[in-house]
Design a protein with these regions (language model features):
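Conserved active-site and cofactor/substrate-binding residues in soluble primary-metabolism enzymes
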Residues: 18-20, 41-45, 75-79, 158, ...
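Generic beta-strand or strand-like secondary-structure segments
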Residues: 49, 53, 80-83, 87, ...
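ATP-dependent small-molecule kinase catalytic core of the GHMP/sugar-kinase superfamily
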Residues: 94-209, 221-252
């Protein structure tokens, strides 16, 4: 979910954790700061800023590997900054959060060990509330449309205070429905109007759907073991690219 906590309130989110995918960074040597990798999800200037903000030397050779689309709304830029700083020697989650905010102006809570158990103020890098674990589920995801980087000055999101209030203690079906409501409010306010996920979810028997509120990432939420045969093909036929399937929640 993502939106405003009351009209005029902070932009908040509950992230969808994807433990099977992300960014890896390896420090391969000393010397002046040097980045290699394909795709390169963080610029040299951003890397230098990040290292400086966590109090580490702006130096070293790093290889960065991301296995999801940069600008896709899957948190790859934040993940890259966090992985870079950890490879350089910083593992202080609060310091990493502050540094990511300074570099990007907005961040995902990926520096924390259980990011999907946080109500996160993304433009403040603050934990507003600790939440209950997400029940075990299967996600069928992909990307619908071109990459779109987050604009930290963009706060034109719907009010989701009622959805946030209903989240604690909700079971998987109820949480999936809350995610669907958040996605639908975002699409109604910001577009696109032809998002295929609500209808696709109904056709495939998903409990609900989720979307990146900036970026093309989309997901269907299923109870474990209930993704139907041919679902990946149906996603591709609906126009999604890089379709992937993973388990999350329940300690996954």
């Amino acid at each position: 979910m993502q939106g405003r906590l009351q009209p005029g309130g902070p932009v908040v989110l509950v992230t969808l954790a994807c433990p099977a995918h992300g960014v890896s960074v390896e420090r391969t040597g000393d010397g002046p700061l040097s980045l290699e990798g394909d795709p390169l999800v963080v610029s040299s200037a951003q890397a230098a800023h990040m290292l400086d903000k966590v109090g580490l030397p702006v130096a070293g050779r790093y290889v960065i590997s991301a296995d999801l689309l940069p600008g896709g709304g899957a948190g790859m830029s934040t993940a890259a900054l966090v992985a870079l700083a950890r490879a350089a020697g910083c593992d202080d989650s609060a310091a990493l959060a502050r540094a990511c905010l300074a570099v990007e102006g907005a961040s995902d809570p990926l520096m924390w060990s259980t990011p999907d158990r946080l109500l996160w103020a993304s433009r403040r890098a603050e934990i507003l509330q600790r939440l209950d674990p997400v029940p075990a589920c299967e996600i069928l995801g992909g990307f619908w449309g071109p990459p779109q980087r987050t604009d930290p000055e963009d706060s034109d999101f719907p009010d989701i205070a009622d959805l946030v209030a209903a989240w604690p203690g909700a079971d998987l079906a109820a949480k999936a429905d809350l995610a669907s409501q958040s996605a639908q409010r975002c699409s109604s306010l910001r577009g696109p109007v032809d998002d295929p996920m609500p209808e696709l979810g109904k056709r495939l028997g998903a409990l609900g759907h989720a979307r990146a509120h900036t970026g093309p990432a989309r997901a269907l939420i299923f109870a474990p073991g209930t993704v139907p045969e041919g679902a990946e093909r149906a996603m591709t036929e609906a126009g999604l690219s890089d379709v992937l399937r993973f388990a999350t929640g329940g300690g996954a």
